[in-house]
Regions:
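Alpha-helical transmembrane segments and their cytosolic membrane-interface
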Residues: 74-142, 228-239, 251
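Soluble N-terminal domains of membrane-associated systems
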Residues: 1-97
Protein backbone atom coordinates (compact mmCIF):
# COMPACT_ATOMS: atom_id res chain seq x y z
CA UNK A 1 0.00 0.00 0.00
CA UNK A 2 1.33 3.48 -0.90
CA UNK A 3 2.47 5.28 2.26
CA UNK A 4 1.91 8.61 0.56
CA UNK A 5 -1.78 7.78 0.20
CA UNK A 6 -2.02 7.11 3.93
CA UNK A 7 -0.46 10.49 4.65
CA UNK A 8 -2.81 12.20 2.25
CA UNK A 9 -5.81 10.52 3.85
CA UNK A 10 -4.80 11.50 7.39
CA UNK A 11 -3.93 15.11 6.61
CA UNK A 12 -7.03 15.61 4.49
CA UNK A 13 -9.29 14.31 7.25
CA UNK A 14 -7.54 16.35 9.96
CA UNK A 15 -7.64 19.53 7.91
CA UNK A 16 -11.36 19.21 7.27
CA UNK A 17 -12.22 18.35 10.87
CA UNK A 18 -10.29 21.37 12.12
CA UNK A 19 -11.92 23.73 9.62
CA UNK A 20 -15.44 22.45 10.29
CA UNK A 21 -15.37 22.90 14.06
CA UNK A 22 -14.41 19.55 15.63
CA UNK A 23 -12.71 19.57 19.03
CA UNK A 24 -9.01 18.74 19.29
CA UNK A 25 -9.33 15.31 20.92
CA UNK A 26 -11.77 14.16 18.24
CA UNK A 27 -9.41 15.28 15.46
CA UNK A 28 -6.43 13.46 16.98
CA UNK A 29 -8.46 10.31 17.56
CA UNK A 30 -9.90 10.30 14.03
CA UNK A 31 -6.50 10.83 12.39
CA UNK A 32 -5.10 7.94 14.42
CA UNK A 33 -8.01 5.69 13.40
CA UNK A 34 -7.51 6.57 9.74
CA UNK A 35 -3.79 5.82 9.89
CA UNK A 36 -4.10 2.52 11.74
CA UNK A 37 -7.04 1.34 9.63
CA UNK A 38 -5.36 2.22 6.34
CA UNK A 39 -3.01 -0.75 6.32
CA UNK A 40 -0.81 -3.14 8.29
CA UNK A 41 2.28 -1.08 7.43
CA UNK A 42 1.47 1.47 10.13
CA UNK A 43 2.75 0.29 13.51
CA UNK A 44 2.43 3.39 15.67
CA UNK A 45 0.90 6.86 15.32
CA UNK A 46 1.40 10.02 17.36
CA UNK A 47 -0.79 13.02 16.60
CA UNK A 48 -0.74 16.56 17.97
CA UNK A 49 -3.29 19.16 16.84
CA UNK A 50 -3.43 22.91 17.50
CA UNK A 51 -6.06 25.36 16.23
CA UNK A 52 -3.78 26.26 13.30
CA UNK A 53 -1.72 23.14 12.65
CA UNK A 54 -1.57 19.34 12.53
CA UNK A 55 1.51 17.33 13.52
CA UNK A 56 1.59 13.59 12.83
CA UNK A 57 4.37 11.06 13.45
CA UNK A 58 3.87 7.66 11.83
CA UNK A 59 6.03 4.56 12.35
CA UNK A 60 6.14 1.87 9.66
CA UNK A 61 8.34 -1.10 8.89
CA UNK A 62 10.87 1.13 7.14
CA UNK A 63 11.10 3.83 9.80
CA UNK A 64 9.39 6.81 11.39
CA UNK A 65 8.19 9.85 9.47
CA UNK A 66 6.88 13.11 10.90
CA UNK A 67 4.88 15.66 8.97
CA UNK A 68 3.07 18.86 9.76
CA UNK A 69 0.42 20.87 7.97
CA UNK A 70 -0.60 24.43 8.66
CA UNK A 71 -4.37 24.91 8.49
CA UNK A 72 -5.33 28.28 7.08
CA UNK A 73 -8.27 29.76 5.26
CA UNK A 74 -11.87 30.34 6.25
CA UNK A 75 -13.51 28.12 8.86
CA UNK A 76 -17.16 27.22 8.65
CA UNK A 77 -19.11 25.50 11.39
CA UNK A 78 -20.58 22.34 9.88
CA UNK A 79 -21.02 19.52 12.37
CA UNK A 80 -22.79 17.45 9.72
CA UNK A 81 -19.52 17.15 7.79
CA UNK A 82 -17.68 16.33 11.02
CA UNK A 83 -20.14 13.49 11.57
CA UNK A 84 -19.67 12.23 8.00
CA UNK A 85 -15.88 12.14 8.41
CA UNK A 86 -16.16 10.24 11.69
CA UNK A 87 -18.53 7.77 10.03
CA UNK A 88 -16.04 7.34 7.18
CA UNK A 89 -13.26 6.45 9.62
CA UNK A 90 -15.44 3.69 11.07
CA UNK A 91 -16.21 2.39 7.56
CA UNK A 92 -12.50 2.23 6.77
CA UNK A 93 -11.81 0.50 10.06
CA UNK A 94 -14.46 -2.15 9.36
CA UNK A 95 -13.20 -2.71 5.82
CA UNK A 96 -16.29 -1.32 4.09
CA UNK A 97 -14.17 0.97 1.89
CA UNK A 98 -10.60 1.21 0.61
CA UNK A 99 -8.12 4.00 1.24
CA UNK A 100 -8.68 5.42 -2.25
CA UNK A 101 -12.44 5.34 -1.73
CA UNK A 102 -11.98 7.14 1.59
CA UNK A 103 -9.90 9.88 -0.05
CA UNK A 104 -12.52 10.31 -2.76
CA UNK A 105 -15.29 10.54 -0.18
CA UNK A 106 -13.34 13.11 1.85
CA UNK A 107 -12.98 15.28 -1.24
CA UNK A 108 -16.69 14.92 -1.95
CA UNK A 109 -17.52 15.91 1.63
CA UNK A 110 -15.28 18.96 1.38
CA UNK A 111 -16.78 20.08 -1.92
CA UNK A 112 -20.39 19.37 -0.97
CA UNK A 113 -22.65 22.33 -0.13
CA UNK A 114 -23.55 23.05 3.47
CA UNK A 115 -26.37 21.01 4.97
CA UNK A 116 -28.47 24.14 5.46
CA UNK A 117 -28.85 26.55 2.55
CA UNK A 118 -28.38 30.30 2.89
CA UNK A 119 -32.14 31.04 3.15
CA UNK A 120 -32.43 28.50 5.97
CA UNK A 121 -29.47 30.08 7.79
CA UNK A 122 -31.05 33.52 7.43
CA UNK A 123 -34.38 32.20 8.75
CA UNK A 124 -32.63 30.56 11.72
CA UNK A 125 -30.82 33.81 12.56
CA UNK A 126 -34.08 35.74 12.35
CA UNK A 127 -36.00 33.31 14.56
CA UNK A 128 -33.27 33.02 17.20
CA UNK A 129 -32.64 36.76 17.39
CA UNK A 130 -36.31 37.65 17.36
CA UNK A 131 -37.26 35.02 19.93
CA UNK A 132 -34.58 36.25 22.31
CA UNK A 133 -36.12 39.72 22.33
CA UNK A 134 -39.42 38.17 23.46
CA UNK A 135 -37.68 36.13 26.16
CA UNK A 136 -36.12 39.32 27.53
CA UNK A 137 -39.48 41.08 27.73
CA UNK A 138 -39.78 42.69 24.32
CA UNK A 139 -43.01 43.12 22.38
CA UNK A 140 -44.10 41.66 19.06
CA UNK A 141 -42.61 44.55 17.11
CA UNK A 142 -39.30 44.01 18.93
CA UNK A 143 -39.30 40.47 17.58
CA UNK A 144 -39.28 41.88 14.05
CA UNK A 145 -36.59 44.45 14.81
CA UNK A 146 -34.42 41.89 16.58
CA UNK A 147 -34.81 39.48 13.68
CA UNK A 148 -33.75 42.13 11.17
CA UNK A 149 -30.77 43.08 13.32
CA UNK A 150 -29.71 39.45 13.63
CA UNK A 151 -29.90 38.96 9.87
CA UNK A 152 -27.83 42.11 9.27
CA UNK A 153 -25.17 41.04 11.76
CA UNK A 154 -24.90 37.45 10.54
CA UNK A 155 -24.82 38.22 6.82
CA UNK A 156 -22.39 41.11 7.23
CA UNK A 157 -20.04 38.81 9.14
CA UNK A 158 -20.34 36.11 6.50
CA UNK A 159 -19.47 38.60 3.77
CA UNK A 160 -16.70 40.64 5.44
CA UNK A 161 -14.82 37.67 6.94
CA UNK A 162 -13.61 36.88 3.43
CA UNK A 163 -11.63 40.12 3.32
CA UNK A 164 -10.64 41.00 6.90
CA UNK A 165 -9.70 39.04 10.06
CA UNK A 166 -12.67 37.63 11.93
CA UNK A 167 -12.18 40.04 14.86
CA UNK A 168 -12.82 43.06 12.64
CA UNK A 169 -15.65 41.31 10.80
CA UNK A 170 -17.45 40.64 14.09
CA UNK A 171 -16.69 44.18 15.29
CA UNK A 172 -18.24 45.72 12.17
CA UNK A 173 -21.26 43.40 12.17
CA UNK A 174 -21.94 44.04 15.87
CA UNK A 175 -21.66 47.78 15.30
CA UNK A 176 -24.14 47.70 12.42
CA UNK A 177 -26.59 45.52 14.35
CA UNK A 178 -26.34 47.75 17.42
CA UNK A 179 -26.69 50.96 15.40
CA UNK A 180 -29.82 49.50 13.81
CA UNK A 181 -31.30 48.98 17.28
CA UNK A 182 -30.29 52.50 18.31
CA UNK A 183 -31.91 53.93 15.16
CA UNK A 184 -35.15 52.08 15.88
CA UNK A 185 -35.17 53.56 19.38
CA UNK A 186 -34.30 57.11 18.26
CA UNK A 187 -37.07 57.07 15.66
CA UNK A 188 -39.53 56.06 18.38
CA UNK A 189 -40.50 52.69 16.96
CA UNK A 190 -39.47 50.90 20.16
CA UNK A 191 -38.41 51.71 23.70
CA UNK A 192 -36.52 48.43 24.20
CA UNK A 193 -33.20 49.41 22.66
CA UNK A 194 -31.16 47.06 24.86
CA UNK A 195 -33.36 44.08 24.11
CA UNK A 196 -33.07 44.62 20.35
CA UNK A 197 -29.29 45.00 20.61
CA UNK A 198 -29.01 41.69 22.45
CA UNK A 199 -31.14 39.99 19.82
CA UNK A 200 -29.08 41.49 16.99
CA UNK A 201 -25.72 40.29 18.34
CA UNK A 202 -26.99 36.83 19.31
CA UNK A 203 -25.81 35.07 16.08
CA UNK A 204 -22.28 36.39 16.67
CA UNK A 205 -21.77 35.05 20.18
CA UNK A 206 -18.83 32.56 20.32
CA UNK A 207 -20.77 29.69 21.88
CA UNK A 208 -19.03 26.86 20.02
CA UNK A 209 -15.57 28.34 20.63
CA UNK A 210 -16.25 28.47 24.38
CA UNK A 211 -17.64 24.92 24.38
CA UNK A 212 -14.69 23.49 22.45
CA UNK A 213 -12.27 25.41 24.66
CA UNK A 214 -13.75 23.88 27.81
CA UNK A 215 -13.82 20.39 26.26
CA UNK A 216 -10.18 20.69 25.19
CA UNK A 217 -9.11 21.88 28.64
CA UNK A 218 -10.99 19.05 30.36
CA UNK A 219 -9.40 16.55 27.94
CA UNK A 220 -5.92 17.84 28.81
CA UNK A 221 -5.31 19.67 25.52
CA UNK A 222 -4.17 22.82 27.29
CA UNK A 223 -2.60 24.58 24.31
CA UNK A 224 -5.66 24.17 22.09
CA UNK A 225 -8.03 24.94 24.96
CA UNK A 226 -6.31 28.20 25.85
CA UNK A 227 -6.05 29.20 22.18
CA UNK A 228 -9.75 28.57 21.54
CA UNK A 229 -10.61 30.38 24.77
CA UNK A 230 -8.56 33.39 23.67
CA UNK A 231 -10.36 33.36 20.33
CA UNK A 232 -13.73 33.39 22.09
CA UNK A 233 -12.55 36.17 24.42
CA UNK A 234 -11.45 38.37 21.52
CA UNK A 235 -14.77 37.78 19.76
CA UNK A 236 -16.69 38.76 22.89
CA UNK A 237 -14.47 41.83 23.26
CA UNK A 238 -15.20 42.87 19.67
CA UNK A 239 -18.94 42.60 20.33
CA UNK A 240 -18.67 44.56 23.58
CA UNK A 241 -16.66 47.36 21.98
CA UNK A 242 -19.12 47.64 19.10
CA UNK A 243 -22.16 47.78 21.39
CA UNK A 244 -20.52 50.37 23.65
CA UNK A 245 -19.59 52.49 20.64
CA UNK A 246 -23.11 52.34 19.21
CA UNK A 247 -24.69 53.33 22.53
CA UNK A 248 -22.19 56.18 23.01
CA UNK A 249 -23.00 57.54 19.55
CA UNK A 250 -26.69 57.66 20.44
CA UNK A 251 -26.19 59.77 23.57
Amino acid sequence: MDEEQIWRLCMLAGNQLLRYGAETSRIEETITHFAVSAGIQVEHVQCFVTPTGIFVSMSTAIGTTTRLERVTGSRILDLDKVTQINSLSRQLQSGECSINDAIDQLEQIDNAPLLYSLPVQILAAALSSGSFTIILGGKGTDFIYGAIGGILAQELTRWTVRFVPRFFAVLLASLVGSLFAVLISVLGFSHHEGVIIIGAILPLLPGLAVTNSIRDLLAGDLLAGVARGAEALFTAAAIAVAVALAISLST
